[in-house]
């Protein structure tokens, strides 16, 4: 847990970035007294070498993300993630991703394989890690900060939880020796800031929503980044909320 202090103002900003044909990325900031105190990234995409998430980060004057989540290994959520790892993460960055199934990446795209290779090299290095790399399943607390007014007038929790992927489905698949890739592994996030809650649903699909326990989705949601680009494969989410 980290402590963040402010004197006059505390703001939360979220930028949901969509590209013309495909690809999405999300950037969020905690802003204290008009200065960014915390920067988070969910997924990456770029076109013609231009990454809008990186532009937003650098515009704030910060060089690194505090929090990065790679929700799942599809190109429309991945292109540019290798550059994020190499240039915009440091030893204090909390890097979260979907669970590893195996080290065999043959069935993935070239971009995903390259990103995996970078992650494996960081994990296997005997030297100090470049960043903390963790995998997420439902009901993980991924981050917690206490934002306190130095005048004592207010104290607010900032927390990030994962509600997906489903440990129930992944455990059953592992026991059966079944390997499924893609959206089944997608990380879904809940961000709480004070009394507000934001859902970033990645590409979580119906199969996962069907088995999630109620307490994983018990928060009143103020903002939803809908799952899987609004596809019918994720249409039961409103029924679960």
Where are these regions (language model features)?
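Core dinuclear metal-dependent hydrolase active-site scaffold
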Residues: 1-64, 135-223, 231
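A short helix->loop->beta-strand "cap" motif at the edges of active sites that frequently abuts
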Residues: 38, 88-95, 128-131
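Acidic, metal-coordinating catalytic cores used for nucleic-acid/nucleotide bond scission
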Residues: 45, 73-79, 229-235
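Metal-dependent catalytic neighborhoods of phosphoester/phosphodiester hydrolases
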Residues: 78-90, 106-117, 236-239
